[in-house]
């Protein structure tokens, strides 16, 4: 079973220590009552991975680990078999001892769009909400973050993160917890909070913005990346049953509307840092994620529209500060 004791000890003497009033009980209850039916299978794959310590680790330009001398072909094959037991891999890519995990999303492209616009992460304590497999947590560590904490209730993502951590030498600078943001107390302890690819899944987007704000220190920075539509500050798309085949998409504002929402929630220095159309090169079917992807979610005759007739995915990055 995944143990969280190292994380508890890590935060016990710092600004996150009040979290320990409820966190151990929450995670104990999760382990008793909420495990996914496939969790034991996933965790078994993690346990059967070798504990490797890379001789070369690059978290700055990617997530890459190498060993000298290199691992044997047999070791690499065994490692690949265990990692394939954790499919589908959605966020990455990862390059591990000669094995390339080509994930559905080129999350490195998103990072390249985000990084130039944010405050330097060196020495910061960071929260990544909806962190997935934790790819961006490792990139945050690569930028010098003191501690990167990810939360995501999807248990496969937790196992994927622990698998990567094991192959990176058990690195304790990044951690993933199987929680949603609504389960966090108002910690007001993170220097930077990221919410990337989450807002449109929330039934109450303004509540989500307040939840993010409540995790930030005074003068802390919010990095918000989400789907948007074209339009002025009054433009918001409320999809019907599905958007790009996703059922749980509730509100897609324009970037100016989202800026107004952030200001309404009390954020200051709000700016629209980047906007980019999602392409079928950035999100696609791969050998590590073999089901449908963006190409199947767009109108086959007009890629400017989804199969439902809505505007195709356009993503924006907004930066804001908690006063």
UniProtKB/Swiss-Prot annotation:
GO molecular function, one term: methyltransferase activity
Keywords of the record: Transferase, tRNA processing
SUPFAM superfamilies on file: S-adenosyl-L-methionine-dependent methyltransferases
Summary of subunit composition and partner proteins: Homotetramer.
Role description: Catalyzes carboxymethyl transfer from carboxy-S-adenosyl-L-methionine (Cx-SAM) to 5-hydroxyuridine (ho5U) to form 5-carboxymethoxyuridine (cmo5U) at position 34 in tRNAs.
GO terms for biological process, alphabetical: tRNA wobble uridine modification
Gene3D superfamilies: Vaccinia Virus protein VP39
Reactions catalysed, as given in the entry: carboxy-S-adenosyl-L-methionine + 5-hydroxyuridine(34) in tRNA = 5-carboxymethoxyuridine(34) in tRNA + S-adenosyl-L-homocysteine + H(+)
Pfam family, one: Methyltransf_9
NCBIfam families, per the entry: PRK15068.1 (NF011650), tRNA 5-methoxyuridine(34)/uridine 5-oxyacetic acid(34) synthase CmoB (TIGR00452)
Keyword Transferase found: yes
Keyword Transferase: yes
Protein name stated in the entry: tRNA U34 carboxymethyltransferase
Family as reported in the entry's similarity comment: Belongs to the class I-like SAM-binding methyltransferase superfamily. CmoB family.
InterPro entries: CmoB, Mo5U34_MeTrfas-like, SAM-dependent_MTases_sf
Enzyme Commission identifier(s): 2.5.1.-
Binding of carboxy-S-adenosyl-L-methionine, residues: 91, 105, 110, 130, 181-182, 196, 200, 315
Broad enzyme group: transferase
